[in-house]
From Swiss-Prot:
It is found in: Cytoplasm. This is 4-hydroxythreonine-4-phosphate dehydrogenase. InterPro entries: PdxA (IPR037510), PdxA_fam (IPR005255). Its EC number is 1.1.1.262. A divalent metal cation binds at H166, H211, H266. Homodimer.
Length: 332
């Protein structure tokens, strides 16, 4: 029997649907103790909005982890700085969001928690407050001193990783270099073996330019950077194939063999997974010293009808975090 683990969850932007997702997932009995790092008053209010009775237990690290009953959650209370109105951003609560992430990250680093699951944040409002914030991936990597984080979204057996994350299109070609591609591929390889238990993985790599550069006629990054980086990893017990044009790589003839695909930038890789698995896929950060999964969607500030809120992505993110933390094999 697997030992019960503790999973810490940050709901994210308080004006968004993160708190609603937590309320909805409380209606299941999980295999781990879920610890929610948030403002308890907002959580209780959202539960009332949904007509759900919620019982909160204050977190005590000296007690053994315990699976909670339906409608019960463990909580680490962190208060918001200002009033919260559903759907309306409040710049004063940006530090609250960072405070919850900081507490959760510290707890994972010191092994207090087995994994972190994050709800959606609003990057813009955090930046507007003066905080240097690019995204969850970059924040968690910086906080944990991880030099080579890899953002990956996955839906069933489709896993799409990114060479670059949240940067403007005009800057992407400047960021793509031999060491970057090589290091990202090594992190992906190690994660496929250690997390997903795939001993001899197959990784496909997208080109940067249309038609993967067309033999250097539409850009030379494929010839000068991507191919040499792939060739330098021939010693690894895996297949790394590419660069392949991004308009071809998502054909079934490639996908059927791919354990992961490395896209060069955010909007090259993620439209495919958002198309086939939106609200049912999971974001996972590879390379961190702890497990971190997340929902595949944003804050959904414009949702008025509570019945439109789906917790499927959050449920999948939690299930994946539990599977990994309890060292279950996650098979293709």
């Amino acid at each position: 029997m697997n030992k019960i683990s503790r999973i810490i969850i940050t709901p994210g932007e308080p004006a968004g649907i993160g708190f609603d997702l937590v309320v909805l997932i409380s209606q299941k009995i999980w295999r781990s103790e879920l610890v929610i790092c948030c403002d308890p008053d907002i959580l209780v209010k959202r539960a009332k909005d949904h007509g759900i009775k919620l019982k909160l237990h204050f977190y005590n690290k000296n007690l053994s982890p315990k699976v909670r009953e339906k409608g019960e959650l463990t909580i680490i209370p962190i208060k918001v700085n200002s009033n919260v109105t559903r759907g309306i951003l409040n710049i004063n609560n940006s530090y609250y969001v960072i405070n919850t992430l900081t507490r959760a990250c510290l707890g994972c680093i010191n092994k207090e928690f087995s994994a972190l699951v994050t709800g959606p944040v609003h990057k813009g409002i955090i930046k507007d407050s003066g905080i240097k914030f690019i995204g969850h991936t970059e924040f968690l990597a910086g906080f944990s001193l991880c030099k080579n984080p890899v953002m990956m979204l996955m839906y069933n057996s489709l896993r799409i990783a990114l060479a670059t994350n949240h940067i403007p299109i005009k800057d992407i070609s400047k960021c793509i270099n031999f060491n970057l591609i090589r290091k990202k591929l090594i992190v992906i390889f190690n994660s496929l073996r250690n997390i997903f238990k795939i001993n001899n993985p197959c990784i496909y790599v997208c080109g940067l330019n249309p038609h993967a550069g067309e033999s250097g006629h539409i850009g030379t990054e494929e010839i000068n950077i991507i191919q040499p980086a792939i060739s330098s990893l021939k010693y690894l017990p895996c297949k790394i194939i590419g660069p392949i044009s991004a308009d071809s790589i998502f054909q079934q003839k490639y996908l059927k063999d791919a354990d992961a695909i490395l896209a060069m930038y955010h909007d090259q890789g993620l439209p495919m997974i958002k198309y086939i698995g939106f609200r049912k896929s999971v974001n996972i950060t590879l390379g961190l010293p702890f497990i971190r999964t997340s929902v595949d969607h944003g804050t959904a500030l414009n949702i008025k009808n509570l019945n439109e809120i789906s917790s499927k992505s959050m449920e999948k993110a939690i299930s994946l975090a539990i599977d990994i933390s309890q060292d279950n094999s996650i098979k293709k």
